[in-house]
Curated annotation (Swiss-Prot):
SUPFAM superfamilies recorded: Nucleic acid-binding proteins, P-loop containing nucleoside triphosphate hydrolases
Keyword hit for rRNA-binding: yes
Note on cofactor: Binds 1 zinc ion per subunit.
Subunit structure as annotated in this protein's UniProt entry: Monomer. Associates with 30S ribosomal subunit, binds 16S rRNA.
Organism encoding this protein: Caldanaerobacter subterraneus subsp. tengcongensis (strain DSM 15242 / JCM 11007 / NBRC 100824 / MB4) (Thermoanaerobacter tengcongensis)
Record-given protein name: Small ribosomal subunit biogenesis GTPase RsgA
Designated gene of the protein: rsgA
The entry's keywords: Cytoplasm, GTP-binding, Hydrolase, Metal-binding, Nucleotide-binding, Ribosome biogenesis, RNA-binding, rRNA-binding, Zinc
Binding residue positions for Zn(2+): C246, C251, H253, C259
Any one biological process term the GO annotation gives: ribosomal small subunit biogenesis
Entry EC no(s): 3.6.1.-
Residues the entry annotates as binding GTP: N114, K115, V116, D117, G165, P166, S167, G168, V169, G170, K171, S172, S173
């Protein structure tokens, strides 16, 4: 029987729907997965043995480049981290925390500042420039006027992406603007996949007309920074070129003497709010380490 490769775009009730060059194949996983305690995830690249044109068995899951727990997905390329410039007010610490979590998971963060149709235009441009200067992709968007949508689409093209951010920032509105028929497409795909047979909620990658997939549920519902405190500084990209000039190799850039990073902050080379985010997250990581050692 013929074997082909594809990406799992949906999994529910023991069925896995694999997007291949032949279309969507409904698959079961071989018993060895249960035996080895391996659960196929949405996003996995799978080797499938065809039973007929529409059905098959998953024989093998190829190595994952990353994996998230909530939502349970694998092999994501990028996180579109959405914050509104106002209503709700932007939380820079949370924004920077999401960037760190993305990079820990080997996911490229894309900063998206939404609701730019509101006032604060100068603030939006300054904020976008902060992140672009560091080396991140950053875009200002409006779900009302459509501003920035073409640039956002260019970042999504041929990538496996999910949207993350607080509630009320306009993630769903942006997804629906990216592709006007995405709800219809979801319905069509669900029909093909037989969603009517199952009532359990599942995660699903939705295909984009211009190439790529977007996850139908927000990512990063669990925001854990689970790294040693000494490693956090390496996830603030703008620190790296200065760190080697600190007096101490172990410098955490808090109140150590001759710290090149704090000097760069004082000179306005490193954005002060980014540095404040770092200090806040460092305290959080230290507290987590303390609790771990107590237990």
């Amino acid at each position: 029987m013929e074997r082909i490769q594809g990406r799992i775009v949906r999994g529910i009730a023991g069925f896995y729907y694999v997007a291949t060059e032949r279309g969507i194949i409904e698959c079961r996983a071989r018993g060895k997965f249960r035996k080895d305690n391996i659960i196929p995830l949405v996003g996995d690249i799978a080797e499938v043995q065809l039973v007929n044109e529409k059905e098959g068995y998953i024989l093998e899951i190829l190595p994952r480049k990353n994996q998230l727990v909530r939502p349970p997905v694998a092999n994501v390329d990028q996180a579109i981290i959405v914050f509104a410039i106002s209503k709700p007010e932007i939380n820079r610490v949370l924004l920077d925390k999401m960037i760190v979590v993305a990079e820990i998971n080997k996911i490229e963060p894309v900063v998206c500042i939404n609701k730019v149709d509101m006032e604060k235009r100068e603030e939006v441009e300054n904020l976008i420039n902060v992140y672009r200067k560091i080396g991140y992709k950053a875009v200002g968007t409006s779900a009302v006027t459509g501003e920035g949508m073409e640039e956002l689409k260019s970042y999504l093209k041929d990538k496996i992406s999910f949207f993350a951010g607080p509630s009320g920032v306009g993630k769903s509105s942006l997804i629906n603007l990216i592709q006007s028929n995405i709800r219809l497409k979801t319905g069509e795909l669900s029909e093909k996949l037989g969603r009517g047979r199952h009532t359990t909620r599942s995660v699903e990658f939705l295909p984009l007309d211009f190439g790529g997939y977007v996850l139908d549920t927000p990512g990063f519902t669990a925001l854990e920074i689970d790294i040693p405190k000494e490693e956090l500084r390496n996830y603030f990209r703008e620190f790296i070129e200065f760190q080697e000039n600190c007096r101490f190799n172990s410098c955490l850039h808090v109140n150590e003497p001759d710290c090149a990073v704090t000097e760069a902050v004082d000179e306005g080379i490193i954005d002060r709010q980014r540095y404040i985010s770092y200090l806040t997250l460092l305290r959080e990581v230290k507290e987590k380490e303390k609790r771990r050692y107590k237990n």
